[in-house]
């Protein structure tokens, strides 16, 4: 969903890109990275999955190297990338791999992005339609009144300002 990716790119402080090692970086990944660049480019962490699908260690290392080099080319050299070797019979990933990702997330400091600090936006919890139902059934194309509940982030939001709701 391109609209969801765009909304996420506008508000994300840290992005975790999960990449399937069998397929590599797909078109949607590059589109999302482009959206992130336009909206301030937050911190991006890559996670490479399905490493257990490679039968030979040589093919695994080659795929890791190619994807890591492409990841660094798109983001920056040295960008953090983690590898998940495979799912255990219990349906979970290895604890040490998950701990490494959690440690990286906990120690990462978020940057103040100029786009977000100069534009106000709402992270909405819920949206309620306040228009009486009998008016909506009479004229389905009418303008409606809605209440948005959530958090205002960025700069001050002026009363009466028009909003874009995806």
Provide a role label for each language-model segment.
Residues 1-2, 10-31, 41-61:
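Conserved Switch II/interswitch segment of TRAFAC-class P-loop GTPases
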Residues 2-5, 160:
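Short secondary-structure capping/turn segments at boundaries of alpha-helices and beta-strands
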Residues 43-45, 52-140, 144-153, 159:
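Canonical P-loop GTPase G-domain recognition
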């Amino acid at each position: 969903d391109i609209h969801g990716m765009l909304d996420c790119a506008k508000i994300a402080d840290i992005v975790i890109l999960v990449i399937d090692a069998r397929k590599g970086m797909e078109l949607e990944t590059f589109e999302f990275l482009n959206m992130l660049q336009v909206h301030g480019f937050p911190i991006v962490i890559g996670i490479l999955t399905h490493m257990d699908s490679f039968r030979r260690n040589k093919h695994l290392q080659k795929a890791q190297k190619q994807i890591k080099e492409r990841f660094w080319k798109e983001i920056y050299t040295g960008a953090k990338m983690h590898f998940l070797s495979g799912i255990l019979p219990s349906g979970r990933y290895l604890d040490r791999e998950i701990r490494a990702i959690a440690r990286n997330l906990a120690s990462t400091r978020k940057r103040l992005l100029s786009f977000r600090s100069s534009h106000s936006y709402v992270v909405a919890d819920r949206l309620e339609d306040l228009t009486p139902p009998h008016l909506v059934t009479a004229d389905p194309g009418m303008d409606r009144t809605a209440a948005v509940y959530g958090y205002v982030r960025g700069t001050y939001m002026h009363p009466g300002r028009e909003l874009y709701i995806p």
